[in-house]
Amino acid sequence: MITGELRSKIDKIWETFWVGGITNPLEVIEQFTYLLFIRQLDEVETIKENEAVFLGIDYKGIFPSDMQHLRWNQFKDREAGEMYQIVLNEVFPFIKGLHQEGDSAYSKYMNDAIFKIPTPAMLSKIVDGIDNLELGDKDAKGDLYEYLLSKVATAGTNGQFRTPRHIIRMMVELMKPTPSDFIIDPAMGSAGFLVAAQEYLRDNHADLFLNAGLREHFNHDMFTGLDMDRTMLRIGAMNMLLHGVDNPIIEYRDSLSEQNTDKDKYTLVLANPPFKGSLDYEAVSADLLKITKTKKTELLFLALILRILKNGGRSATIVPDGVLFGSSNAHKDIRKEIVDNNKLEAVISMPSGVFKPYAGVSTAILIFTKTGAGGTDKVWFYDMKADGYSLDDKRQPIQDNDIDDIIARFNKMDEEVNRKRTEQSFLVDVDEIRKNGYDLSINKYKEVEYEAVEYPKPQEIISKIMTLEEEIKQGIEELEKML
């Protein structure tokens, strides 16, 4: 989570945008992100230059020798008017033109990017503010993006809530992406899941970059992100490029419509799809309605995931609690489809405070594998009580954190067999789930131990009351004598 100092600095920059007339939060984020991107391009270039010197090899960077003045560390200290002209007329066209040699995701969505900062003085103040942000590690950069995105007042009007990075990382750790995976987030937002997946691969499969085929797959075919918000597509494309993925497949597409024809294509889905949207039947792909006839986006996305996964493909998806126990035919149909025709592996119940202060909804993570032929045997349930942060609007860091325990228990499923229903995690046989109408809420199967409380006998209570009454009577008599 973001530190108080970083939050304060971002708020000051945000205020500069606001005072300068850019008051739409999405526009602020977009302009803020362009300048962050320009700064980080220079930082990445400097790191690569230093590595080349250390290794004694030639390095051809993205800034040609005649364009060195376009680098952040070259223009940031210039006089306001001169800086403004450089950024407006040279730097911004330069970043829009990156990767134009191919039909890259980045170039596709940067084509209609517009530089909107109106005055040299405003730009100078914003550049100073961004230059003073301490962004030395990837956590700080992630915190900054997360906090910026939290300021979008419209996020959530269509049910899209940002997923906290530590929850994203947990889901990625549980799914263990491999170098041969085809990974998709069908409601990608700023590409948080895709960024976390590529970080996991760099940390755990660094040798993939020594293999030309795997390296090509990583940079061009492995990652797919879909969204209907062009601003978020731009931010997501910049986010992936800054994290070293050259050309992910990022597309403007309504995942639930007939426009999306993907089927049996991906090996891993990581998603937190919109919860609160409600669509007309006409806007939804007909084959999704065959699985579950509903207007609810959270159910339709589960049907979509089953369609787009290859057999053997896995999914970790966040759903609102209502998906787990909803009594409508549509709710039951999608749960039945996952349990009976595929392999449901885990239901991780999360506390409602996980999405605060932006949403107080209770959620769970469903982990399943597409088989098309069943396979559900025992389903693992975990009752997450803490995620390392307070569950109020402040979300301050605390000691209690179940995330490491969740990952450890999930990876040692053999040891879960003997756990009791009174423990934080346990296994439930699929037949019991069927008997309970495919209810997947943990409270349906959890057992609570009640400690026996011994109360005094009625005669003892009456005796104590009478003694107390006598003491009160004596006290009143003594008080009357004093008057």
Task: For the regions a language model picked out, list residue spans one by one.
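Conserved Class I SAM-dependent methyltransferase catalytic core
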Residues: 28, 228-233, 250, 295-368
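Conserved S-adenosyl-L-methionine
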Residues: 157-271, 276-278, 287, 295, ...
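Short, contiguous acidic/charged loop-to-helix segments that flank catalytic cores in large enzymes
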Residues: 23, 280-296, 322-330, 351-358, ...
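Short acidic (Asp/Glu) and glycine-rich catalytic loops that position anionic groups and cofactors
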Residues: 11, 124, 216, 246-250, ...
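Non-catalytic, mostly N-terminal accessory regions of nucleic-acid modification and defense proteins
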Residues: 1-179, 249-260, 349-353, 375-390, ...
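Conserved nucleotide-binding/hydrolysis micro-motifs of P-loop NTPases
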Residues: 42, 190, 230-231, 257, ...
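C-terminal, active-site-flanking charged/polar segments
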Residues: 343-344, 356-406
